[in-house]
Amino acid sequence: MMIEVNHAGDRPGIAATAGLHPSAVVIGNVEIGGEVYIGPNAVIRADEPSADGSVGAIIIEREANIQDGVIIHALGGTGVRIGRGTSIAHGAVVHGPSEIGENCFIGFNSVIFKASLGDGVIVLHQALIEDAAIPNGLVVPSMTAVRDKEDMMRFAPVSPELAKFALKVRQTNVFLAEVSSLIRSTGKSNRSGE
């Protein structure tokens, strides 16, 4: 894995129980919580300066997961917060300023830019959320562009089936974080120590 300091001297803070794939890239003012999984080829960059040279933080809270090929970045002086237990699926882009609540699911190849998502929001695949605030517990359908409140009028609450799916994804990735963390710290490939 590539872990780098940014131009401002900010070094990533990574919890000992986080699991990072060897091909992940983490740069600058990034905080990664415990039991977080960072998948192959994920890029998390907090390196774009504001006019005064400061760099906003990217914060990934406990039990979140950043899957294969995800990019997380922010405009100069802004940040990104990924809430506890949130899944950012393969190929998604989260660009700050953005905040994603707890226990959310962001689907494959979706883009979140200058947006705020409440807790329990599920964004299905290839959606675009830009300059919008999504309230708690709604589903954004696949291939949907969301740019204002009118776009949200057609969104349904999260169904029990989708909530169960999001929980399963979270649980699977917490397991992957545990295994990756174990391999990183001991060189062993399973929890029994073999």
Language-model regions, residue ranges each:
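Glycine/small-residue-rich phosphate/adenosyl-binding loop
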Residues: N65
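Glycine-rich hexapeptide-repeat left-handed beta-helix
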Residues: M2-G13, N41, R45-D47, A51-A57, ...
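N-terminal segments that cap or nucleate solenoid repeat domains
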Residues: M1-N41
